[in-house]
Amino acid sequence: SCLLLQFTDKRFQPVHDLTIGVEFGARGAAGALLVYDITRRTASNVEEAFINTAKEIYEK
């Protein structure tokens, strides 16, 4: 939600509501977007987990 707000309105909102049920809105999506901090070493571990999760969702 905050990322979308940044891209659409070019503003940051430090306090936000949780995006409950986002997995339901993602059903039938044609793509996915992975955003992470490449300056952090632990961020590289995110890629494999993201791909595995995306595959699981796609196969349902």
Curated annotation (Swiss-Prot):
Which family does the UniProt entry place this protein in? Belongs to the small GTPase superfamily. Rab family.
Q: Which UniProt keywords apply?
A: Cytoplasmic vesicle, Endoplasmic reticulum, ER-Golgi transport, Golgi apparatus, GTP-binding, Hydrolase, Lipoprotein, Magnesium, Membrane, Metal-binding, Nucleotide-binding, Protein transport, Transport
Q: Which organism is it from?
A: Mesocricetus auratus (Golden hamster)
Molecular function terms, GO-annotated: G protein activity; GTP binding
Q: What does this protein do?
A: The small GTPases Rab are key regulators of intracellular membrane trafficking, from the formation of transport vesicles to their fusion with membranes. Rabs cycle between active GTP-bound and inactive GDP-bound states. In their active state, drive transport of vesicular carriers from donor organelles to acceptor organelles to regulate the membrane traffic that maintains organelle identity and morphology.
Q: Which superkingdom is the protein from?
A: Eukaryota
Q: What SMART domains is this protein classified in?
A: RAB (SM00175)
GO cellular component term of the entry, any: endoplasmic reticulum membrane
Protein name, entry field: Ras-related protein Rab-2A
Place the motif Effector region on the sequence: 16-24
Substrates-to-products reaction catalysed: GTP + H2O = GDP + phosphate + H(+)
Q: How is its activity regulated?
A: Regulated by guanine nucleotide exchange factors (GEFs) which promote the exchange of bound GDP for free GTP, GTPase activating proteins (GAPs) which increase the GTP hydrolysis activity, and GDP dissociation inhibitors (GDIs) which inhibit the dissociation of the nucleotide from the GTPase.
Reported EC number(s) for this entry are 3.6.5.2
For GTP, which residues are the binding ones? 1-2, 19
Membrane topology is: Lipid-anchor
- Binding-site positions, Mg(2+): 1, 19
State where the protein is found.
Endoplasmic reticulum-Golgi intermediate compartment membrane; Melanosome; Endoplasmic reticulum membrane; Golgi apparatus membrane
- UniProt GO BP: autophagosome-lysosome fusion; Golgi organization; protein transport
UniProt entry tagged with the keyword Protein transport = yes
Cofactor(s) needed, names only, are: Mg(2+)
